[in-house]
Amino acid sequence: NFINFHLKDSKVLDLFSGIGSFGLECISRGSKFVFFLENYPPVLEILKINISNLKYETKSKVIDIDAFKINNNTFKDDQKFQIIFCDPPYKEKKIELLIKNIIEMNILEENGIIIIHRKKGDLDIYPKKFKVIDTKNYGLSTFVFGRKI
């Protein structure tokens, strides 16, 4: 429900997209456009097939890149997102650097949200310019919702 409120006509950045579950669901619920970032070849192919099967090619773009390597050249100069979803592998420990990079690149809209999917119990450190506004636990997962400050 928290996410539904923000989806209407939103632009979404889905980092570590996998087969696209989050981003595809966003489109189905009213997002205007989703950028999918994934770089594992077998999963990337499934993601492209899923987008094609749902006929979402005009509402999405797939970028074959490691999300930790995004920079200002990855997107258009004025590109901003209302929602940025980060679903890195559970073993990944560079979350602080990723969030710091997102904030420094200034690709999050003023009132946009960053959602981070983590293993329940992980104690991540976040940059000073990121404020956690909510957390939700589901099974073995935790979703951290935050904003830049």
Language-model segments: what does each one mean?
Residues 1-149:
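Class I S-adenosyl-L-methionine-dependent methyltransferase catalytic core
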